[in-house]
């Protein structure tokens, strides 16, 4: 089968590999659509310690069931599904609490298993969910990440919020903030095209940097800041923009080390929460939102769909500042 394989830093290659066969309880999907995630761009640049080349990445995907392993009864050949890419033990305290994203031995399809940048991918059958559209189905996973981040932010009606980063997770976060009752939703991104696109998702203010949103009279202006980038600078900015008692949720994964003012956190009673992946319930909510066919903006100028063969060029474009918030590869 054909694969898009990360072979070295800043190198994606179209290669061939044997088609995998599902074990008991697993299924093989003929990949229909797979999104390029910001964490994969970080890996591509050599900034993500979880990913090591050579690797077939791809954890945001949909596909058609092509083969089922022994004992699988919940899906059948021909079904169009998406899949939760988290593979966990099911026995540790976190799994037993319904918090599989914290599993002590968690693994992820596209990192620890070959991912969906290939014609075929293997997934656990009990983590598959029916979707109505192949392209939309590849957007469930990033939406589940946004669902968790906004849930951790504990938005109240009338809250003010800012989202740093107008990639797809940032944009989905904007939409969810609006649905949660936030009245002022600002978006920060250096890309002018992405800022314009954020209005389609419900942004009320846009700026190329956080300083442009803050005033001398109100240097700390927001109840909540969601950092969907993950740089040291954006993490520090997220704290500097909060009112006293404000909440910062970090969902972006990029730089490992960040120097913070601990006294500021104490004196202003700030909350800082990390947000990683999602619970099963949050993933299921994302499936429901996508299948409602009402969540995503009708105007899709934020999305571009390309062939797998265009994958190497797409990675280069995205790291150099693409106007598209999401590129999905198809077969």
Curated annotation (Swiss-Prot):
Function of the molecule: Catalyzes the NAD(+)-dependent dehydrogenation of 2-dehydro-3-deoxy-L-rhamnonate to 2,4-didehydro-3-deoxy-L-rhamnonate. Also has weak dehydrogenase activity on butane-2,3-diol. Does not show any detectable activity in the presence of NADP(+).
Pfam families linked to this entry: ADH_N (PF08240), ADH_zinc_N (PF00107)
Binding residue positions for Zn(2+) 1: 37, 59-60
GO terms, biological process: rhamnose catabolic process
Cofactor: Zn(2+)
Family: Belongs to the zinc-containing alcohol dehydrogenase family.
Cofactor details (free text): Binds 2 Zn(2+) ions per subunit.
EC number(s) stated in the UniProt entry for this protein: 1.1.1.401
Activity under varying temperature: Optimum temperature is 50 degrees Celsius.
SUPFAM superfamilies: GroES-like (SSF50129), NAD(P)-binding Rossmann-fold domains (SSF51735)
Site for Important for catalytic activity for the proton relay mechanism but does not participate directly in the coordination of zinc atom, residues: 141
pH dependence, entry free text: Optimum pH is 9.5.
GO molecular function: oxidoreductase activity; zinc ion binding
Transmembrane segments: none
Enzyme class, broadest EC rank: oxidoreductase
Catalysed transformations (reactions): 2-dehydro-3-deoxy-L-rhamnonate + NAD(+) = 2,4-didehydro-3-deoxy-L-rhamnonate + NADH + H(+)
Pathway(s) annotated for this protein in UniProt: Carbohydrate degradation; L-rhamnose degradation
Organism for this UniProt entry: Sulfobacillus thermosulfidooxidans (strain DSM 9293 / VKM B-1269 / AT-1)
InterPro entries: ADH-like_C (IPR013149), ADH-like_N (IPR013154), ADH_Zn_CS (IPR002328), GroES-like_sf (IPR011032), NAD(P)-bd_dom_sf (IPR036291), Zn_alcohol_dh (IPR050129)
Keywords: Carbohydrate metabolism, Metal-binding, NAD, Oxidoreductase, Zinc
Record: residues binding Zn(2+) 2: 89, 92, 95, 103
Protein name (Swiss-Prot/TrEMBL): 2-dehydro-3-deoxy-L-rhamnonate dehydrogenase (NAD(+))
Taxonomic lineage of the native organism: Bacteria, Bacillati, Bacillota, Clostridia, Eubacteriales
Residues the record lists as binding NAD(+): 169, 189, 194, 251-253
């Amino acid at each position: 089968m054909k694969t898009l394989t990360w072979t070295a830093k800043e190198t994606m290659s179209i290669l061939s590999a044997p088609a995998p066969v599902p074990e008991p309880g697993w299924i093989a999907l003929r990949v229909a659509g797979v999104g390029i995630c910001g964490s994969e761009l970080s890996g591509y640049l050599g900034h993500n310690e979880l990913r090591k080349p050579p690797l077939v990445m791809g954890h945001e995907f949909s596909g058609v069931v092509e083969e089922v392993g022994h004992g699988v009864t919940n899906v059948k050949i021909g079904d169009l599904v998406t899949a939760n890419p988290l593979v966990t033990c099911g026995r540790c305290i976190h799994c037993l609490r319904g918090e599989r994203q914290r599993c002590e031995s968690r693994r992820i399809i596209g990192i620890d298993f070959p991912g969906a940048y290939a014609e075929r991918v293997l997934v656990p059958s009990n983590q598959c969910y029916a979707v109505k559209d192949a392209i939309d189905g590849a957007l469930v996973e990033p939406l589940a990440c946004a669902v968790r981040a906004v849930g951790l932010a504990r938005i109240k009606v009338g809250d003010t919020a800012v989202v740093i980063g107008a990639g797809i997770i940032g944009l989905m976060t904007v939409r969810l903030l609006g649905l949660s009752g936030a009245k002022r939703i600002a978006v920060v991104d250096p890309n002018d095209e992405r800022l314009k696109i954020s209005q389609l998702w419900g942004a009320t203010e846009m700026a190329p940097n956080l300083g442009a949103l803050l005033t001398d009279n109100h240097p700390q202006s927001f109840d909540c800041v969601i950092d969907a980038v993950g740089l040291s600078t954006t993490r520090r900015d997220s704290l500097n923009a909060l009112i006293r008692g404000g909440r910062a949720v970090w969902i972006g994964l990029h730089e490992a080390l960040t120097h913070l003012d601990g006294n500021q956190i104490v004196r202003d009673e700030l909350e800082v929460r990390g947000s990683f992946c999602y619970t099963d319930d949050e993933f299921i909510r994302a499936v429901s939102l996508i299948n409602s066919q009402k969540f995503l903006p009708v105007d899709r100028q934020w999305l571009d769909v390309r062939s797998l063969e265009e994958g190497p060029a797409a990675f280069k474009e995205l790291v150099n500042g693409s106007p598209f918030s999401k590129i999905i590869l198809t077969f």
